[in-house]
Amino acid sequence: YFADAANAVLQVADGTLTPVVDDIIFTNLALTGLTSQLSSGSKQLAVAHGLYDAVSKLFKPQRARLLHGEIVSCGIPVQLAVNGYSEEYIEKNVRFLELIGTPTQFSQLGIEPTEENLEQILAFIFDNVGIDEPALQEKIRKNFARVMK
């Protein structure tokens, strides 16, 4: 998938439409819908989209210049770590996100990576998603360090 997706990004940048581009687009649409249905009610699966919601509410000027997927992209490394994926897998995803030009750090969203901003975002996510288990809160807090640059 990663190799085909990287090729598709390059082809689109060149203005070329190929079956690989079609396949990646349709795969992403299908996976997004499936993930949305499967994750309904799962708090661990809500971190990346929780970041989007927090940015939309707390950092409106930054939100205005970003696409939904760009903000969610920044939360993916956190999401993967919270869900227990290996460091190798997380790094592979981060490299791919960087390859396609989506943010993987707060600073790329235009948000200062300060403790105050992190605490505002975490409070919003915990409240909005209903994450009240201290162990899960701490796991999420710890893994946000991945995107605090």
Task: Describe each PLM feature range.
Residues Y1-R95:
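Active-site segments that bind and position negatively charged phosphate/pyrophosphate groups
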Residues Y85-K149:
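C-terminal charged capping/lid subdomain of soluble metabolic enzymes
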